């Protein structure tokens, strides 16, 4: 309705009579006063109903009837509420509504998520309703702000949106983590990454990006893993590895700034320390080689405050190692030039050191781990063909990808950012399941 305003906008209407469409999140009261906690998807705030005001507005009989109806409103009843906006210094939100009229739109009976503590499995079983809670609303607002900031960054930096397929006949990375499906009598796989297709896009259109769901059949139950999640991939020609890191750093800082600018209420709801987020914008990200990181971990492995296992050169990092490294530096940290043995086949070797590849993982501080993976891509046809064979992959499945190296191959690089990991980091939340509307995990595919 044209005459409705959003709760988040009431600050612009102090002293004015406004009308809001909302749901009753909670209610309390005594005697002639009722306090309604209203939500509309933009914010939560309090509406105050005073019985004498209702009688003054509607007469004794109708005013009393309206007040009694309000007194018996149940949780999640939908309403139109009319009233005067007032500043309220006692409220975190800073405003409240002095109600002059209320109209019930839709009744709500026996709402299962009552204002008390509930177990996580119960809340996930009722995820379609849990999304209505204050915290989950804030998480979705942070997610939305990151998505919009992504599109804004790519538009301002000359990227073209390039849509890669979700169904594919081959793997981008690890073939053991694929979801396989029948495709008219043949095998097809749900996409792990749009990266290979983005490379084709970059050779045709220049700077390109893709945003969509990807799938990993990882049997992992950690707080960082989902089987279905959203990736923001980018690819660009005529760019080296170091230049790619500059782009990634600018991108992540733009995302954080976008949330600070456009989801401040959500961050306040989540009690996120925004001074830390501002620090990450203002401070250059750290860049540390894989081998230097191993040396650092070995040097500190016997410190009192360490809880990670011993690592040798050639080992991959576990979550405790990533957490310790990023906390040691206190800012997002690029770990560069990993061993080729556990990275993807398409990564270009470090010049003069074929056992290391020109790649980087960006580790977020505060224990949030990897949020970006990127690399410079191999441009030599013969070397790439050999890598495909060395990884036990069928070169025939990658004929089209190899051909990109036959017709005007150029230096190019790119990266992929896991949206839910970025949301978890910026929001300061503990588990990735809250960063997506309907999480898909090894033990959950409903609702």
Swiss-Prot record:
Q: Which InterPro entries match?
A: Aa-tRNA-synt_II, aa-tRNA-synth_II, aa-tRNA-synth_II/BPL/LPL, Asn-tRNA-ligase, Asp/Asn-tRNA-synth_IIb, NA-bd_OB-fold, NA-bd_OB_tRNA
Q: What is its main location?
A: cytoplasm
User: Would you tell me the Gene Ontology cellular component terms?
Assistant: cytoplasm
Q: Which reaction does it catalyse?
A: tRNA(Asn) + L-asparagine + ATP = L-asparaginyl-tRNA(Asn) + AMP + diphosphate + H(+)
Pfam families in alphabetical order: tRNA-synt_2 (PF00152), tRNA_anti-codon (PF01336)
Compartments annotated for it: namely: Cytoplasm
Keyword presence, Ligase: yes
Instruction: Return one Gene Ontology term, BP aspect.
Output: asparaginyl-tRNA aminoacylation
The residues forming the signal peptide are: none
Enzyme Commission number(s) of this protein: 6.1.1.22
List, in alphabetical order, the Gene Ontology terms for molecular function in this entry.
asparagine-tRNA ligase activity; ATP binding; catalytic activity, acting on a protein; nucleic acid binding; transferase activity
Q: How does it assemble?
A: Homodimer.
The record's family statement is:
Belongs to the class-II aminoacyl-tRNA synthetase family.
By its UniProt entry, which HAMAP family does this protein fall under?
Asn_tRNA_synth (MF_00534)
Q: What is this protein called?
A: Asparagine--tRNA ligase
Report the source organism: Lactococcus lactis subsp. lactis (strain IL1403) (Streptococcus lactis)
Originating gene = asnS
């Amino acid at each position: 309705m044209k005459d409705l305003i959003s709760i988040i906008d009431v600050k612009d209407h102090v002293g004015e009579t406004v009308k809001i469409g909302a749901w009753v999140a909670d209610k309390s009261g005594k005697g002639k006063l009722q306090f309604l906690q209203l939500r509309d998807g933009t914010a939560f705030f309090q509406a105050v109903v005073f019985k004498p005001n209702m009688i003054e507005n509607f007469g004794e009989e109708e005013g009393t009837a309206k007040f009694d109806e309000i007194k018996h409103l149940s949780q999640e009843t939908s309403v139109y509420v009319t009233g005067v906006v007032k500043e309220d210094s006692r409220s975190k939100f800073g405003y409240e509504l002095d109600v002059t009229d209320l109209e019930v739109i839709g009744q709500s009976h026996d709402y299962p998520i009552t204002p008390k503590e509930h177990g996580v499995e119960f809340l996930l079983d009722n995820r379609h309703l849990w999304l209505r809670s204050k915290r989950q609303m804030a998480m979705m607002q942070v997610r939305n702000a990151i998505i919009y900031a992504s599109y804004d960054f790519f538009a301002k930096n000359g990227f073209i949106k390039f849509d890669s397929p979700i169904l594919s006949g081959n793997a981008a990375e690890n073939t053991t983590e694929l979801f396989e499906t029948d495709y008219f009598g043949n095998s097809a796989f749900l996409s792990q990454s749009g990266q290979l297709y983005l490379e084709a896009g970059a050779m045709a259109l220049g700077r390109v990006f893709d945003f969509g769901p990807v799938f990993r059949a990882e049997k992992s139950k950690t707080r960082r893993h989902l089987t279905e999640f959203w990736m923001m991939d980018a690819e660009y020609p005529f760019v080296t590895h170091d230049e790619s890191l500059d782009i990634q750093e600018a991108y992540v800082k733009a995302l954080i700034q976008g949330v600070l600018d456009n989801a401040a209420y959500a961050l306040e709801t989540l009690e996120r320390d925004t001074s830390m987020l501002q620090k990450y914008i203002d401070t250059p990200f750290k860049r540390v080689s894989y081998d230097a990181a191993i040396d650092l971990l070995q040097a500190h492995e016997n410190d009192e405050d360490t809880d990670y296992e011993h690592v040798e050169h050639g080992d991959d990092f576990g979550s405790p190692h990533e957490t310790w490294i990023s906390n040691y530096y206190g800012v997002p940290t690029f770990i560069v030039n990993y061993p080729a043995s556990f990275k993807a086949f398409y990564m270009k070797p470090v010049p003069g050191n074929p056992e290391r590849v020109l790649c980087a993982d960006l580790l977020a501080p505060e224990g949030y781990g990897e949020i970006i993976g990127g690399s410079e891509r191999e441009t030599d046809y013969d070397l790439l063909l050999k890598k495909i064979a060395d990884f036990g992959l069928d070169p025939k499945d990658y004929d089209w990808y190899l051909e990109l190296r036959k017709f005007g191959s150029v230096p190019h690089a790119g990266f992929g950012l896991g949206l839910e990991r970025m949301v978890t980091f910026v929001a300061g939340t503990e588990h990735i399941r809250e960063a997506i509307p309907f999480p898909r995990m090894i033990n959950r595919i409903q609702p």
